[in-house]
A protein has these predicted regions:
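N-terminal prosegments of processed precursors
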Residues: 26-180, 297
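Intrinsic disorder/low-complexity segments enriched in polar/small residues
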Residues: 3-7, 28, 98, 114, ...
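Fold-level signature of zinc-dependent metallopeptidase catalytic domains
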Residues: 29-32, 48, 52-63, 184-332
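General secondary-structure propensity
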Residues: 13, 128-130, 250
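Bacterial Sec-dependent N-terminal signal peptides
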Residues: 1-31
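Intrinsically disordered, low-complexity segments enriched in Ser/Pro/Gly/Ala and basic residues
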Residues: 2, 16, 22, 39, ...
Length: 335
């Protein structure tokens, strides 16, 4: 267990039951250079390795619920072959090539498997705090739209569900989200949302902090940045457990998929991150539902030490509280 250096409280206030994952890949399109993900794909090809082509998605369907029509102006709904999904989850091929149906066309994508969980990864719950949860990790991938080196993709495959994000200048940020009604997948771009995802950050930044970070990134080339892997401890609240059908597996699947999206952004900046440990609240968690700052302080008190370099609390409880973090804290001790 390590001393607490930085605790970052995240309040994932998204329409979880309707629109799926947060659009966290939006930053990746702001570059004229190939992304690190694109360079990884290129290196894989240069080694004459083979992308396994799979036919996962079926043709588009006409189904779209009234609830969805109020949120999205246009989208694609398509079924997937669950046998193929299970095969990807079970076999975890090194590289995949598949097509995503979207608004009458097919987006051809290339994916490479990544390891987002630390070799010693374990998960625990409040129900049995000292007993590790039996968890089978998903198949986690990053990649690009074929021929588009500025695009970035993160897709996570599990036994009965996949989560995915595709980000590019041409399409915006596309989300692949399983519909609860019939199991088909809703595929839409954030450009076509009629409502914007709410999100508030309550972090108090020192004056000029953002500019200082930007200068640091600009002054240091991608190839010379530190290669140390940042280990991340993740804790989830009781409300998220309830939202995911009172299933620890569902919670960990969902949050590791979210982490894959976020870690892809960091990977494009040559920062490697992995999840070192996971903790699921399967009972009342005691964190504030009215103030993210209060919840952050409670989290610090409850977790004076943890297995990782950074700790995140991902919470659904509360009402659009947003997120909060301590800034400039990695070199300081807390607790």
């Amino acid at each position: 267990m390590k001393s607490t250096k930085l605790i970052h409280f995240l309040m994932w206030i998204v329409i979880l039951s309707v629109l799926g994952l947060p659009s966290v890949l939006a930053q990746t399109v702001n570059t004229i250079h190939p992304t690190k993900t694109a360079l990884s794909v290129k290196e894989f090809k240069n080694q004459r390795k083979i992308f396994e082509k799979v036919e996962l998605f079926g043709p588009e369907t006409d189904y779209l619920s009234t609830r969805m029509e109020k949120s999205i102006t246009k989208s694609t709904v398509a079924a997937i072959d669950n046998k193929v999904l299970h095969q990807i989850f079970a076999e975890k091929p090194v590289a995949l090539e598949l097509e995503i149906p979207f608004l009458g066309q097919s987006i051809e994508i290339e994916l490479i498997k990544v390891d987002i969980l630390d070799a010693g990864f374990q998960a625990f719950s409040s129900g049995e705090p000292g007993k590790a949860i039996k968890y089978t990790p998903g198949a986690y991938y990053r990649g690009i739209i074929k021929g588009d080196e500025q695009s970035t993709i993160a897709i996570s495959f599990f036994d009965d569900i996949l989560y995915g994000m595709i980000s590019s200048g041409d399409y915006g940020n596309i989300t692949l989200n399983k519909l609860q009604d019939n199991g088909d997948y809703l595929i839409y771009s954030d450009r076509d949302l009629t409502i914007k995802q709410p999100g508030i950050c309550e972090t108090i930044e020192p004056e000029g902090y953002a500019q200082e970070i930007q200068r640091a990134l600009s002054d240091q080339s991608l190839t010379t940045r530190a290669t140390k892997c940042v280990k991340v401890y993740i804790e989830t609240d009781y409300a998220l457990y309830q939202n995911k059908g009172n299933s620890t597996t569902n919670v960990i699947n969902y949050m590791t998929a979210v982490f894959n999206n976020v870690a892809t952004l960091y990977a494009n900046e040559q920062i490697t991150t992995q999840v070192s440990e996971f903790y699921v609240w399967t009972s009342a968690d005691g964190y504030s539902k009215t103030s993210s700052t209060t919840a952050l302080n409670q989290f610090k008190s409850k977790r004076p030490s943890y297995n990782g370099d950074i700790a995140h609390l991902a919470a659904l409880g509360g009402n659009n509280l947003g997120g909060v973090a301590w800034v400039d804290a990695l070199c300081s001790n807390y607790g």
